[in-house]
Protein backbone atom coordinates (compact mmCIF):
# COMPACT_ATOMS: atom_id res chain seq x y z
CA UNK A 1 0.00 0.00 0.00
CA UNK A 2 1.40 3.37 -1.02
CA UNK A 3 1.11 5.70 1.95
CA UNK A 4 0.52 9.46 1.58
CA UNK A 5 2.98 12.07 2.75
CA UNK A 6 2.73 12.80 6.47
CA UNK A 7 5.01 15.75 7.35
CA UNK A 8 4.18 15.69 11.07
CA UNK A 9 5.53 12.15 11.36
CA UNK A 10 8.36 12.38 8.83
CA UNK A 11 9.79 15.68 10.08
CA UNK A 12 10.25 14.60 13.71
CA UNK A 13 12.70 12.29 15.41
CA UNK A 14 10.44 10.08 17.51
CA UNK A 15 11.11 8.37 20.82
CA UNK A 16 8.51 5.95 22.00
CA UNK A 17 7.56 5.04 25.54
CA UNK A 18 5.41 2.06 26.48
CA UNK A 19 4.24 2.12 30.09
CA UNK A 20 3.20 -1.56 29.95
CA UNK A 21 6.78 -2.59 29.17
CA UNK A 22 8.25 -0.13 31.66
CA UNK A 23 6.06 -1.23 34.58
CA UNK A 24 2.99 -3.45 33.97
CA UNK A 25 1.65 -2.47 37.40
CA UNK A 26 2.04 1.28 36.83
CA UNK A 27 -0.82 3.19 38.44
CA UNK A 28 -3.15 5.19 36.21
CA UNK A 29 -2.14 8.37 38.02
CA UNK A 30 1.50 7.65 37.17
CA UNK A 31 0.70 7.16 33.47
CA UNK A 32 -1.06 10.53 33.57
CA UNK A 33 1.97 11.99 35.35
CA UNK A 34 4.14 10.88 32.45
CA UNK A 35 1.77 12.74 30.11
CA UNK A 36 2.32 15.87 32.20
CA UNK A 37 6.07 15.20 32.28
CA UNK A 38 6.71 14.57 28.60
CA UNK A 39 5.18 17.87 27.54
CA UNK A 40 7.61 19.63 29.92
CA UNK A 41 10.61 17.45 29.05
CA UNK A 42 10.50 18.15 25.32
CA UNK A 43 12.52 21.41 25.51
CA UNK A 44 15.41 19.37 26.99
CA UNK A 45 15.65 17.18 23.88
CA UNK A 46 17.98 18.05 21.03
CA UNK A 47 18.60 16.47 17.66
CA UNK A 48 19.01 17.11 13.96
CA UNK A 49 15.23 17.35 13.56
CA UNK A 50 12.35 18.45 15.80
CA UNK A 51 11.87 15.97 18.63
CA UNK A 52 8.63 14.09 19.23
CA UNK A 53 7.39 11.46 21.66
CA UNK A 54 5.00 8.57 21.16
CA UNK A 55 3.53 7.45 24.48
CA UNK A 56 1.53 4.23 24.87
CA UNK A 57 -0.15 4.29 28.27
CA UNK A 58 -2.80 1.60 28.15
CA UNK A 59 -4.10 0.74 31.62
CA UNK A 60 -4.94 -2.88 32.35
CA UNK A 61 -6.69 -2.33 35.66
CA UNK A 62 -10.34 -1.37 34.96
CA UNK A 63 -10.21 2.39 35.44
CA UNK A 64 -12.21 5.46 34.51
CA UNK A 65 -10.11 8.50 33.65
CA UNK A 66 -12.34 11.38 34.66
CA UNK A 67 -12.20 14.88 33.23
CA UNK A 68 -12.34 18.29 34.85
CA UNK A 69 -16.07 18.70 34.22
CA UNK A 70 -16.76 15.35 35.91
CA UNK A 71 -15.15 16.67 39.08
CA UNK A 72 -17.96 19.26 39.28
CA UNK A 73 -20.84 16.76 39.28
CA UNK A 74 -23.36 17.56 42.04
CA UNK A 75 -23.25 14.07 43.60
CA UNK A 76 -19.70 13.17 42.61
CA UNK A 77 -19.11 11.01 45.68
CA UNK A 78 -22.10 8.81 44.81
CA UNK A 79 -20.82 8.45 41.25
CA UNK A 80 -17.36 7.46 42.44
CA UNK A 81 -18.83 4.98 44.90
CA UNK A 82 -20.78 3.47 42.00
CA UNK A 83 -17.56 3.00 40.02
CA UNK A 84 -15.95 1.30 43.01
CA UNK A 85 -18.96 -1.01 43.36
CA UNK A 86 -18.53 -1.98 39.70
CA UNK A 87 -14.89 -2.88 40.34
CA UNK A 88 -13.40 0.21 38.69
CA UNK A 89 -10.68 2.50 39.92
CA UNK A 90 -10.58 6.14 38.83
CA UNK A 91 -8.16 8.99 38.28
CA UNK A 92 -8.46 12.63 37.23
CA UNK A 93 -6.73 13.28 33.92
CA UNK A 94 -4.98 16.52 32.91
CA UNK A 95 -6.69 16.82 29.51
CA UNK A 96 -10.21 16.23 28.27
CA UNK A 97 -13.33 17.41 30.04
CA UNK A 98 -15.19 14.12 30.55
CA UNK A 99 -14.55 10.52 31.55
CA UNK A 100 -13.29 7.62 29.45
CA UNK A 101 -12.96 3.93 30.29
CA UNK A 102 -9.68 1.99 30.39
CA UNK A 103 -9.27 -1.78 30.49
CA UNK A 104 -7.00 -4.38 28.83
CA UNK A 105 -8.77 -3.96 25.46
CA UNK A 106 -8.43 -0.16 25.26
CA UNK A 107 -5.37 1.38 23.62
CA UNK A 108 -4.19 4.80 24.81
CA UNK A 109 -1.67 6.71 22.72
CA UNK A 110 -0.23 10.20 23.05
CA UNK A 111 1.82 12.21 20.54
CA UNK A 112 3.90 14.99 22.08
CA UNK A 113 5.80 17.65 20.14
CA UNK A 114 7.21 21.17 20.45
CA UNK A 115 5.20 23.90 18.73
CA UNK A 116 8.33 26.04 18.39
CA UNK A 117 9.69 23.65 15.77
CA UNK A 118 6.44 22.40 14.22
CA UNK A 119 3.57 24.86 14.77
CA UNK A 120 0.07 23.39 14.79
CA UNK A 121 -3.27 25.04 15.41
CA UNK A 122 -5.66 23.28 17.78
CA UNK A 123 -7.62 21.76 14.90
CA UNK A 124 -4.47 20.81 12.97
CA UNK A 125 -3.11 18.97 16.02
CA UNK A 126 -6.29 16.93 16.30
CA UNK A 127 -6.13 16.21 12.59
CA UNK A 128 -2.67 14.63 12.92
CA UNK A 129 -4.09 11.96 15.22
CA UNK A 130 -7.14 11.47 13.00
CA UNK A 131 -4.83 10.96 10.03
CA UNK A 132 -2.66 8.44 11.90
CA UNK A 133 -5.61 6.36 13.10
CA UNK A 134 -7.27 6.62 9.70
CA UNK A 135 -4.20 5.21 7.95
CA UNK A 136 -4.03 2.37 10.47
CA UNK A 137 -7.56 1.28 9.56
CA UNK A 138 -7.02 1.05 5.80
CA UNK A 139 -5.74 -2.57 5.96
CA UNK A 140 -9.03 -3.51 7.63
CA UNK A 141 -11.07 -1.95 4.85
CA UNK A 142 -12.41 0.69 7.24
CA UNK A 143 -12.86 4.39 6.59
CA UNK A 144 -12.43 6.71 9.55
CA UNK A 145 -14.47 9.87 10.03
CA UNK A 146 -14.19 12.49 12.74
CA UNK A 147 -17.28 14.18 14.13
CA UNK A 148 -19.14 14.39 17.41
CA UNK A 149 -21.21 11.45 18.62
CA UNK A 150 -23.27 13.36 21.17
CA UNK A 151 -24.65 10.32 23.03
CA UNK A 152 -21.26 8.69 23.53
CA UNK A 153 -19.20 9.15 26.66
CA UNK A 154 -16.73 12.04 26.36
CA UNK A 155 -18.21 13.36 23.09
CA UNK A 156 -16.14 15.79 21.06
CA UNK A 157 -15.74 17.32 17.62
CA UNK A 158 -12.97 14.85 16.81
CA UNK A 159 -14.64 11.63 17.91
CA UNK A 160 -13.24 8.71 15.88
CA UNK A 161 -16.12 7.18 13.96
CA UNK A 162 -16.43 4.08 11.78
CA UNK A 163 -19.73 3.22 10.11
CA UNK A 164 -21.58 5.79 12.19
CA UNK A 165 -20.35 4.41 15.53
CA UNK A 166 -17.64 5.81 17.77
CA UNK A 167 -14.51 3.69 18.29
CA UNK A 168 -12.43 6.27 20.14
CA UNK A 169 -11.83 9.87 21.05
CA UNK A 170 -9.10 12.50 21.17
CA UNK A 171 -8.04 15.08 23.74
CA UNK A 172 -5.37 17.76 23.59
CA UNK A 173 -3.20 19.56 26.13
CA UNK A 174 -0.77 22.44 25.69
CA UNK A 175 1.86 23.70 28.10
CA UNK A 176 3.97 26.66 26.99
CA UNK A 177 5.36 25.43 23.63
CA UNK A 178 4.60 21.77 24.33
CA UNK A 179 1.68 19.91 22.76
CA UNK A 180 0.21 16.51 23.58
CA UNK A 181 -2.57 15.00 21.52
CA UNK A 182 -3.93 11.82 23.12
CA UNK A 183 -6.40 9.25 21.84
CA UNK A 184 -8.11 6.19 23.18
CA UNK A 185 -9.17 3.39 20.83
CA UNK A 186 -11.68 0.72 21.85
CA UNK A 187 -9.86 -2.15 20.17
CA UNK A 188 -11.97 -5.02 21.49
CA UNK A 189 -14.05 -6.07 24.50
CA UNK A 190 -17.58 -5.22 25.58
CA UNK A 191 -18.15 -1.64 24.49
CA UNK A 192 -21.81 -1.73 25.48
CA UNK A 193 -20.78 -2.56 29.05
CA UNK A 194 -18.33 0.35 29.07
CA UNK A 195 -21.05 2.73 27.90
CA UNK A 196 -23.50 1.35 30.46
CA UNK A 197 -20.89 1.89 33.17
CA UNK A 198 -20.55 5.55 32.25
CA UNK A 199 -24.32 5.99 31.98
CA UNK A 200 -24.65 4.55 35.48
CA UNK A 201 -21.90 6.82 36.77
CA UNK A 202 -23.59 9.96 35.47
CA UNK A 203 -26.95 8.86 36.81
CA UNK A 204 -25.51 8.14 40.25
CA UNK A 205 -23.61 11.44 40.25
CA UNK A 206 -26.74 13.47 39.52
CA UNK A 207 -25.67 14.70 36.09
CA UNK A 208 -27.93 17.18 34.31
CA UNK A 209 -28.45 17.56 30.57
CA UNK A 210 -25.09 19.28 30.12
CA UNK A 211 -23.46 15.87 30.63
CA UNK A 212 -23.64 13.03 28.09
CA UNK A 213 -26.85 11.02 27.92
CA UNK A 214 -24.87 7.89 27.09
CA UNK A 215 -26.43 5.44 24.63
CA UNK A 216 -24.44 2.19 24.21
CA UNK A 217 -25.77 1.75 20.67
CA UNK A 218 -23.71 4.65 19.29
CA UNK A 219 -20.34 3.10 20.21
CA UNK A 220 -18.46 0.00 19.07
CA UNK A 221 -14.99 -1.55 18.97
CA UNK A 222 -12.44 -1.79 16.20
CA UNK A 223 -12.67 -5.59 16.30
CA UNK A 224 -16.45 -5.50 15.85
CA UNK A 225 -16.22 -2.92 13.08
CA UNK A 226 -13.74 -4.96 11.05
CA UNK A 227 -15.41 -8.28 11.84
CA UNK A 228 -12.27 -10.10 12.90
CA UNK A 229 -10.41 -10.90 16.12
CA UNK A 230 -8.08 -8.13 17.22
CA UNK A 231 -6.22 -7.36 20.41
CA UNK A 232 -4.65 -4.22 21.81
CA UNK A 233 -1.04 -5.37 21.54
CA UNK A 234 -1.28 -6.37 17.89
CA UNK A 235 -2.96 -3.07 17.00
CA UNK A 236 -0.28 -1.18 18.92
CA UNK A 237 2.40 -3.00 16.92
CA UNK A 238 0.64 -1.96 13.72
CA UNK A 239 0.71 1.68 14.83
CA UNK A 240 4.41 1.39 15.61
CA UNK A 241 5.08 -0.05 12.17
CA UNK A 242 3.03 2.68 10.54
CA UNK A 243 4.91 5.48 12.31
CA UNK A 244 8.20 3.72 11.51
CA UNK A 245 7.34 3.90 7.82
CA UNK A 246 7.69 7.68 8.05
CA UNK A 247 10.46 8.01 10.62
CA UNK A 248 12.61 5.76 12.75
CA UNK A 249 11.30 5.16 16.28
CA UNK A 250 13.89 5.06 19.06
CA UNK A 251 13.00 3.55 22.47
CA UNK A 252 12.72 6.27 25.09
CA UNK A 253 14.55 6.20 28.41
CA UNK A 254 12.31 6.45 31.47
CA UNK A 255 15.47 6.99 33.55
CA UNK A 256 16.70 10.00 31.57
CA UNK A 257 18.30 12.34 34.14
CA UNK A 258 16.29 15.31 32.89
CA UNK A 259 13.00 13.38 32.83
CA UNK A 260 13.17 11.78 36.29
CA UNK A 261 12.95 14.97 38.40
CA UNK A 262 10.15 16.31 36.19
CA UNK A 263 8.24 13.05 36.61
CA UNK A 264 8.76 13.00 40.38
CA UNK A 265 7.24 16.47 40.62
CA UNK A 266 4.34 15.76 38.26
CA UNK A 267 3.65 12.45 39.99
CA UNK A 268 2.84 14.35 43.15
CA UNK A 269 0.53 16.65 41.19
CA UNK A 270 -1.22 13.70 39.56
CA UNK A 271 -1.60 11.86 42.87
CA UNK A 272 -3.07 14.99 44.44
CA UNK A 273 -5.61 15.32 41.61
CA UNK A 274 -6.79 11.75 42.11
CA UNK A 275 -6.64 11.95 45.90
CA UNK A 276 -9.02 14.90 45.77
CA UNK A 277 -11.57 12.54 44.19
CA UNK A 278 -11.03 9.80 46.75
CA UNK A 279 -11.45 12.37 49.52
CA UNK A 280 -14.95 13.07 48.17
CA UNK A 281 -15.94 9.45 48.78
CA UNK A 282 -14.25 9.25 52.18
CA UNK A 283 -15.86 12.46 53.44
CA UNK A 284 -19.29 11.20 52.42
CA UNK A 285 -18.74 7.87 54.14
CA UNK A 286 -17.56 9.61 57.31
CA UNK A 287 -20.54 11.97 57.48
Features from the language model and the residues they span:
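Aromatic/basic-lined ligand-recognition segments
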Residues: 164-172, 180
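Beta-rich nucleic-acid/ligand-interaction surfaces
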Residues: 146-167
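Long, positively charged amphipathic alpha-helical accessory segments at protein N-termini or as interdomain linkers
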Residues: 140-142, 177-287
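Local beta-strand/beta-hairpin segments that build beta-sheet-rich folds
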Residues: 17, 167-168, 218, 222
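Short amphipathic alpha-helical segments
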Residues: 30, 34, 75, 121-132, ...
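Contiguous, small/hydrophobic- and glycine-enriched helical/loop subdomains that border
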Residues: 107-150
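N-terminal lobe of the biotin/lipoate ligase/transferase fold
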Residues: 1-119
Amino acid sequence: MALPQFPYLSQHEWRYFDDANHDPALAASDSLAYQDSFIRWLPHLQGDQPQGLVHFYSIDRPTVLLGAKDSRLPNLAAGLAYLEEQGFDYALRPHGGLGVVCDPDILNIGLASDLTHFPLSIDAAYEQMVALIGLSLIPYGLELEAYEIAQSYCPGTYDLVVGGQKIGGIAQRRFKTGLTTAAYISVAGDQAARAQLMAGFYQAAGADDSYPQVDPAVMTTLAHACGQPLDRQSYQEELIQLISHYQKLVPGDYQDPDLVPIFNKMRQVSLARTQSLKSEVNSTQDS
